[in-house]
């Protein structure tokens, strides 16, 4: 059985608030792709506290909470996807609070998740790198707006994680 709990525009804070739903279902596997909206969310009242470290720590907290409350669930954290600021003009700058380019924030989040994976109960699926073009941006082949995947992007994603899905359900 597959249950999609993805919510458009969701943040790590939203997922943390809804973990009881996951505990209820006790899934065999869980594929987590979250974090980009945290760094996009400039309207958050806690914007100053949202950093790559805090986003990565929230993602890890989600995985660890699921393991603690549903120990048979295999948690797979998918790395945050790159963006293409040439296509999505609003992404060309940085957030004024953190003078770190968005692409670098994404890389920092992914780096922290990867480094801490051996100490925690999750597998990392590195999606970020398979979507990069030669300029280290989200390839135009996989997006029409620089942020969201298009049909080709979803096909690449599903093909890449299919082995993890097979492993999780066996």
Please state what every model-predicted region is.
Residues 1-11:
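A short beta-strand-loop structural module common to alpha/beta enzyme folds
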Residues 16-170:
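Alpha-helical cap/lid subdomain in secreted, periplasmic
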């Amino acid at each position: 059985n597959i249950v999609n709990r993805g919510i458009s525009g969701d943040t790590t804070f939203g997922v943390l608030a809804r973990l009881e739903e996951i505990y209820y279902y006790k899934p065999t596997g869980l594929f987590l792709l979250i974090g980009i909206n945290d760094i996009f969310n400039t309207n958050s009242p806690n914007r100053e506290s949202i950093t790559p470290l805090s986003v990565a720590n929230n993602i890890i907290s989600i995985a660890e909470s699921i393991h603690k409350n549903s120990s048979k669930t295999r948690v797979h954290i998918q790395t945050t996807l790159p963006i293409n600021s040439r296509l999505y003009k609003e992404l060309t700058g940085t957030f004024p609070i953190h003078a770190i380019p968005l692409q670098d924030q994404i890389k920092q989040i992914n780096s922290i998740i990867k480094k801490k994976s051996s100490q925690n109960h999750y597998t990392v699926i590195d999606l970020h790198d398979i979507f990069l073009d030669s300029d280290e941006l989200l390839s135009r082949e996989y997006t029409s707006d620089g942020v969201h995947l298009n049909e080709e992007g979803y096909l690449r994603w599903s093909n890449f994680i299919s082995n993890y899905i097979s492993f999780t359900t066996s």
